[in-house]
Swiss-Prot record:
One of its GO terms (cellular component) is membrane. Signal peptide: none annotated. This is Beta-amyrin 28-monooxygenase CYP716A378. GO terms for biological process: saponin biosynthetic process; sterol metabolic process; triterpenoid biosynthetic process. It comes from Saponaria officinalis. It comes from the Eukaryota. The chain crosses the membrane at residues 3-23. The gene is CYP716A378. Its cofactor is heme.
Length: 485
């Protein structure tokens, strides 16, 4: 963390002491029986500790240390990203939040989102999300997803040939990001040229970090870098949008070929079409959601398969049975995906131990009582995946890697939440499943590997990532399966 950044936080905190005093008196006067907890420093609250625990590799510490302190309560108060927050933990809390979407709570994003996605200031980030959810079902329905599988397989093959084959050592995380970003560009924008894809792929790391950061727009801060990166990507997207408009008018592009064409040609309920900034921001959000979480999952699949040879052997056996059933040049299809039951159990266990989505915020629409505590209107609520994923009451021996947890009906409801839950469950969950399984198929049938840094630190910012990118030594199989067309 840059020295001037820390100094800036301290200075801002000092200037906010009077505001904190007035706020404390106002809250006390209202007489709420609030959850136990503390609000931390003025303005920044406990944001630094909340974020720094992730940077240091143990994001669950912020949650579990407070749960232990306020036991048996499963809810505590804090202040994060400039907001008063009730952190709600456990399956019962998850059920309450997911079941009361649109009734007692609504989705909420930090104010930093409005800076990075400026079109959302015209309405609100919540309204923008609603619009997106109306646009997405066509592209994530089963028949559409089935059509994507051969395309995903083709891109995975090309990615392996370009980035993995012929190399003895690689860093997994950057390559996983290239794979998932290439897929998102191909399926959302019909961009298939790796050079074009690479042109605006790099800034996405800064965008994701900026979204969940302390919203201080000073040079060098994560928030400032996120804003700058989003502007770079947005300009590139506007160029793509202008060209697509020309291609559609000249019949060089299809109205149904991808999400971009759909956005350009579909009016809202009032007959109005989205402008270029609206479309650029929505595509930007899709590209972030469409590749960031899946790339983290793919990376940790590689990590755990390197650490657990018996798990690797089970995945290898399943994937080789599928590979050997294919004709030369034949791509994966829906039936093949349905056979990858053990592989998906492994991926699910990976996402239990390293959830790509660490948690999410809601906003209280009105005052309500929960577990004997008053939650005031306007307060933010935060649910944490780790509060159940690493809870022995939900998953016995939670640190043990056990894909069998997902056999049969799987974990109890509201305990396994890597994609959220309720009406706000990630609409791209099935899309993510496909890109993860296609990745597993293509890497396992080509290689075994070993980690080059046995105890590499895992950082969370905002998703879990290996601090050094997960360098591995590749060991190609002696008799690789033919994959060329």
């Amino acid at each position: 963390m840059e020295l001037f950044f820390i100094c800036g936080l301290v200075l801002f905190s000092t200037l906010s002491l009077i505001s904190l005093f007035l706020l404390h008196n106002h809250s006390s006067a209202r007489g709420y029986r609030l959850p136990p907890g503390r609000m931390g420093w003025p303005f920044i609250g406990e944001s630094y500790e909340f974020l720094a625990n992730g940077w240091k590799g143990y994001p669950e510490k912020f949650i579990f240390s407070r749960l232990a302190k306020y036991k048996p309560n499963q809810v505590f108060k804090t202040s994060i990203l400039g907001e008063k927050v009730a952190v709600m933990c456990g399956a019962t809390c998850n059920k309450f939040l997911f079941s009361n979407e649109g009734k007692l709570v609504n989705a909420w994003w930090p104010n930093s989102v409005n800076k990075i996605f400026p079109s959302s200031t015209q309405t609100s980030s919540k309204e923008e999300a609603k619009k997106m959810r109306k646009l997405l079902p066509t592209f994530f329905k089963p028949e559409a997803l089935q059509r994507y599988i051969p395309i995903m397989d083709e891109i995975a093959i090309r990615h392996m040939e370009d980035e993995w084959e012929g190399k003895s050592k690689i860093e997994v995380f950057p390559l996983a990001k290239r794979y998932t970003f290439w897929l998102a560009c191909r399926l959302f924008l019909s961009i298939d040229d790796p050079v074009h894809v690479a042109k605006f792929a790099d800034p996405f790391n800064d965008i994701a970090s900026g979204i969940i950061s302390i919203p201080i727009d000073l040079p060098g801060t994560p928030f400032n870098r996120g804003i700058k990166a989003s502007n770079v990507v947005r300009q590139e997207l506007k160029t793509i949008i202008k060209q697509r408009k020309l291609d559609l008018s000249d019949n060089k592009a299809s109205p149904t070929q991808d999400i971009l064409s759909h956005m350009l040609l579909t009016p809202d309920e009032d007959g109005r079409y989205m402008n270029e900034l609206d479309i650029a921001d929505k595509i930007l959000g899709l590209l972030i959601g469409g590749h960031d979480t899946a790339s983290a999952a793919c990376t940790f699949v590689v990590k755990f398969l390197a650490e657990l040879p018996h798990i690797y052997d089970g995945v290898y056996k399943e994937q080789m049975e599928i590979a050997k059933s294919k004709k030369e040049g034949e791509r994966l299809n829906w039936e093949d995906i349905q056979k990858m039951k053990y592989s998906w159990n492994v991926a699910c266990e990976v996402m239990r131990l390293a959830p790509p989505l660490q948690g999410a915020f809601r906003e209280a629409l009105s005052d309500f009582m929960y577990a004997g505590f008053q939650i005031p209107k306007g307060w933010k609520l935060y649910w944490s995946a780790n509060s159940t994923h690493r809870n022995p009451e939900c998953f016995p021996e939670p640190e043990k890697f056990d894909p069998a947890r997902f056999d049969g009906s799987g974990p109890a409801p509201y305990t396994y939440v890597p994609f959220g839950g309720g009406p706000r469950m990630c609409p791209g969950k099935e899309y993510a499943r496909l890109e993860i399984l296609v990745f597993m198929h293509n890497i396992v049938k080509r290689f075994k590997w070993e980690k080059l840094i046995p105890d590499e630190t895992i950082v969370v910012n905002p998703m879990p990532t290996p601090a050094k990118g997960l360098p591995v030594r590749l060991r190609p199989h002696s008799k690789p399966v033919t994959v060329s067309a």
